[in-house]
C-alpha cells in the first residue's frame, strides 16, 4: 500500500486524480494540497487528508509519490520553493523537454532545474514502458500529444511513413482548464467551432520532440475547440512509403497494440467517437489508406482528462510500483 499526494487537487485534472486514486486498491492514504478548495465537502473520506500547500513541507517525506496537477511553470516554482519528493509525476509541461532551451523557447520560462531533466522520463506507457518502470520522475504527456503519438507510433515503428504528418485535432473545453476565459465561457463555445493557437500551439514542439525519439517526421498541427466538455478527436493524415491496403494497415495497428489493454483498434470502415471514450483510459483508433494519395488516414479518440491526463498518470504510477497496469483504471465509458 502507498501514500499519495496531489498538489493542485482542485483543478479539473486534480479532481480526476482524486476520483481515481480514492478507489485505487493500493492507495492507503490520499493527501490533497491546494490553496483553492471551494467545496471541501466533496472530499470527505477517511482515506483523504485535505490541506493547503503550506503543509506539503511537513508531509512530503511520508509520501511514496506526488502528483503535480499544476500549470506550466507552476511545478518548477513549487519545487524551487519546496523539497523534491522521492517520486513525482508532473502533469505540466515543465519536464517534457530534455533541452531547457527548447522549453524556454516554447513556454517563455527559463528552466530553473535543468539538472533534473535527464532524470525525468516521458510518460507515454505504450511507447516508453521500460523506461517508466525504472523511473523516479515522470513527465506526463499533454492531451493532444497523447492522441497524436498513439496514432503515429505504429507507422513510425515500422518505417512506413516519411515527410509531413498533418494532425487536425479537436478538443472539448475542459482542456483549457478550470479558470474561465473568453473562449471557454458557455455563450462563446455553444453552437460554435473554431481553430486556435494556429501554427504556434505549444503541443506541436512536444509532439515533434517525441517523434524524433521514435524516428523522424515533421508535424503540422492545428487544434480546434468544439462545444463538448471532455474529449479529443484527432484526424491524422500522413504519406506512406509503400502501397498497402486498409486491411493490411488495420492488421499492423492490431499487431503493434495487441498487448495494450487501453488501446482499442477499430476496423477501417469505423470511426472512434468521443462519447464512447468519456470517463475511460482508452484510446480508440482506426486507420485506413487513401489509395488516390497513398496517405494513411488515422482517427484517434481519447478523454483528455483521463487518458490525456489523470488516467495516464495513474497508469504510469502503476508501472512505477509494479502493479497491474489497469489497476484502478478499469472504467466503462460514461455512455450515453
From Swiss-Prot:
Recorded catalytic activity of this chain's protein: N-acetyl-L-glutamate 5-semialdehyde + phosphate + NADP(+) = N-acetyl-L-glutamyl 5-phosphate + NADPH + H(+)
GO cellular component terms attached to this protein's record: cytoplasm
Enzyme class: oxidoreductase
Subcellular location as annotated: Cytoplasm
SMART domains tied to this protein: Semialdhyde_dh
InterPro entries recorded: AGPR_AS, AGPR_type-1, NAD(P)-bd_dom_sf, NAGSA_dehydrogenase, Semialdehyde_DH_NAD-bd
One annotated GO molecular function: NAD binding
NCBIfam families the record matches: argC
Protein name in UniProt: N-acetyl-gamma-glutamyl-phosphate reductase
Keywords attached to this entry: Amino-acid biosynthesis, Arginine biosynthesis, Cytoplasm, NADP, Oxidoreductase
Free-text function comment from the UniProt entry: Catalyzes the NADPH-dependent reduction of N-acetyl-5-glutamyl phosphate to yield N-acetyl-L-glutamate 5-semialdehyde.
GO biological process: L-arginine biosynthetic process
Pathway involvement of the protein, from the record: Amino-acid biosynthesis; L-arginine biosynthesis; N(2)-acetyl-L-ornithine from L-glutamate: step 3/4
Disulfide bonds: none
SUPFAM superfamilies for this protein: Glyceraldehyde-3-phosphate dehydrogenase-like, C-terminal domain, NAD(P)-binding Rossmann-fold domains
HAMAP family listed in its UniProt record: ArgC_type1
Catalytic activity, EC: 1.2.1.38
Source organism superkingdom: Bacteria
Family per similarity comment: Belongs to the NAGSA dehydrogenase family. Type 1 subfamily.
Residues annotated as the enzyme's active site: 143
Amino acid at each position: 500500500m502507498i501514500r499519495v499526494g496531489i498538489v493542485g487537487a482542485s483543478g479539473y485534472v486534480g479532481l480526476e486524480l482524486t476520483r481515481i486514486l480514492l478507489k485505487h486498491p493500493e492507495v492507503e492514504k490520499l493527501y490533497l494540497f491546494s490553496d483553492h478548495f471551494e467545496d471541501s465537502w466533496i472530499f470527505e473520506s477517511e482515506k483523504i487528508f485535505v490541506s493547503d500547500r503550506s503543509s506539503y513541507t511537513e508531509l512530503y517525506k511520508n509520501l511514496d509519490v506526488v502528483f503535480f496537477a499544476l500549470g506550466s511553470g507552476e511545478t518548477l516554482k513549487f519545487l524551487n520553493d519546496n523539497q523534491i519528493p522521492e517520486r513525482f509525476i508532473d502533469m505540466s509541461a515543465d519536464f517534457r523537454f530534455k533541452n531547457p532551451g527548447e522549453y524556454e523557447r516554447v513556454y517563455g520560462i527559463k528552466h530553473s532545474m535543468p539538472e533534473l531533466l535527464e532524470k525525468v522520463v516521458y510518460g507515454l506507457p505504450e511507447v516508453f514502458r521500460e523506461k517508466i518502470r525504472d523511473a523516479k520522475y515522470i513527465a506526463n504527456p499533454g492531451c493532444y500529444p497523447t492522441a497524436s503519438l498513439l496514432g503515429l507510433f505504429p507507422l513510425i515503428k515500422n518505417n512506413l511513413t516519411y515527410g509531413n504528418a498533418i494532425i487536425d485535432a479537436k478538443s472539448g473545453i475542459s482542456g483549457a482548464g478550470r479558470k474561465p476565459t473568453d473562449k471557454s465561457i458557455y455563450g462563446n463555445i455553444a453552437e460554435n467551432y473554431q481553430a486556435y493557437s494556429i501554427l504556434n500551439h505549444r503541443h506541436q514542439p512536444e509532439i515533434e520532440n517525441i517523434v524524433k525519439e521514435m524516428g523522424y517526421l515533421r508535424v503540422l498541427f492545428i487544434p480546434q475547440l468544439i462545444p463538448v466538455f471532455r474529449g479529443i478527436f484527432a484526424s491524422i493524415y500522413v504519406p506512406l512509403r509503400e502501397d498497402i491496403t486498409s486491411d493490411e494497415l488495420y492488421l499492423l495497428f492490431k499487431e503493434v497494440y495487441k498487448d495494450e489493454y487501453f488501446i482499442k483498434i477499430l476496423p477501417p470502415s469505423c470511426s472512434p467517437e468521443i462519447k464512447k471514450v468519456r470517463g475511460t483510459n482508452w484510446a480508440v483508433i482506426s486507420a485506413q489508406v487513401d489509395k488516390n494519395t497513398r496517405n494513411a488516414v488515422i482517427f484517434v479518440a481519447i478523454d483528455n482528462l483521463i487518458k490525456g491526463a489523470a488516467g495516464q498518470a495513474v497508469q504510469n504510477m502503476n508501472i512505477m510500483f509494479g502493479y497491474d497496469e489497469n489497476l484502478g483504471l478499469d472504467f466503462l465509458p460514461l455512455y450515453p
